[in-house]
UniProtKB/Swiss-Prot annotation:
This is 4-hydroxy-tetrahydrodipicolinate reductase. Its EC number is 1.17.1.8. InterPro entries: DapB_C (IPR022663), DapB_N (IPR000846), DapB_N_CS (IPR022664), DHDPR_bac (IPR023940), NAD(P)-bd_dom_sf (IPR036291). Its main location: cytoplasm. Keywords: Amino-acid biosynthesis, Cytoplasm, Diaminopimelate biosynthesis, Lysine biosynthesis, NAD, NADP, Oxidoreductase. SUPFAM superfamilies: Glyceraldehyde-3-phosphate dehydrogenase-like, C-terminal domain, NAD(P)-binding Rossmann-fold domains. The active site is at H154, K158. One of its GO terms (biological process) is lysine biosynthetic process via diaminopimelate. NAD(+) binds at G8, A9, A10, G11, R12, M13, E33, G97, S98, T99, A121, P122, N123, M124.
């Protein structure tokens, strides 16, 4: 059985990952939290609500990584890159679901993953990744005759904007249309800003309440509109996806993979 360690184990996402891993028949070998966290030393299973596992939450990154086959990390880019570096040194696989990576940070992640297999994906949902494939095909079919706008909604605690999933959706569409996403993405419209350019991809964000995550991509033509939407009802789809990725990554060749690789959509 695969031994999985979870970073951010006492958080909402970390708890759901622990539950999903146990349900999938994996072994929870380690549970990591930041130094000084009030739940360090407590049983990770009891914190997650799935019963005692005999695994105490720890702040010792090296020890936690040493004891696992795969580390699952939903934290921040800075923490994830540090964890990726340690996993590389110890030849352990890692699954990263953190969002908010800059292009430079993604490039660094690829460099750090030269010697180990790693999955880096802004969204672990099977449905969202099917949407990525649909968006690519649809953009190629529609071409430049349709304007593209993206709207994403999340809870009021989310720290990054726009979401990593929304950005990836924009990147997929831009790549399919032969555009540079960083050049055509429009995150801000206010006042007299002129007509919309044909190439731009608009990005709008909404933050409020407890919305887990909603994304809609609009392809807007003359007299017609196509919408591709995904709505997350709970975080469990992300946790199950991360465990699926962890089981898939073991034994793979070194390199940086994404959920399209995990799901065989490439």
């Amino acid at each position: 059985m695969i031994k999985i360690a979870v970073c951010g184990a006492a958080g909402r996402m970390g708890q759901r990952i622990i539950v999903a891993a146990v349900e999938a028949g994996c072994i929870i070998s380690g549970a990591l939290e930041r130094p000084g966290h009030p739940q360090i030393g407590q049983d990770a299973g009891l914190i997650a609500g799935c019963g005692q596992l005999g695994v105490a939450i720890s702040d010792d990154l090296n020890a936690v990584v040493e004891g696992c086959d795969v580390l699952i990390d939903f934290t921040t880019p800075k923490i994830s890159l540090k964890n990726l570096e340690v996993c590389g040194l110890k030849k352990k696989s890692i699954v990263i679901g953190s969002t908010g990576f800059t292009p430079e940070e993604r490039a660094l992640a690829a460099e750090l993953a030269k010697d180990i297999p790693a999955v880096l994906a802004p969204n672990m949902s099977v449905g969202v990744n099917v949407c990525f494939k649909m968006l690519k095909d649809l953009a190629k079919t529609l071409g430049d005759d349709f304007d593209v706008e993206i709207v994403e909604l999340h809870h009021n605690k989310k720290k990054d904007s726009p979401s990593g999933t929304a950005v990836r959706m924009g990147e997929v569409v831009a790549e399919a249309l032969g555009r540079d996403y960083n050049q055509v993405a429009n995150y801000h419209r206010e006042g007299i800003c002129g007509e919309r350019t044909k190439e731009e991809i608009g990005m709008q964000t909404v933050r409020g309440g407890d919305i887990v995550g909603e994304h809609t991509v609009y392809f807007i033509g003359m007299g017609e509109r196509i919408e591709i939407s995904h709505r997350a009802m709970s975080r469990d789809m992300f946790s199950r996806g991360s465990v699926r990725a962890a089981k898939w990554i073991v034994g793979k060749q070194p390199g940086l993979y994404d959920m399209q690789d995990v799901l065989g959509l490439k």
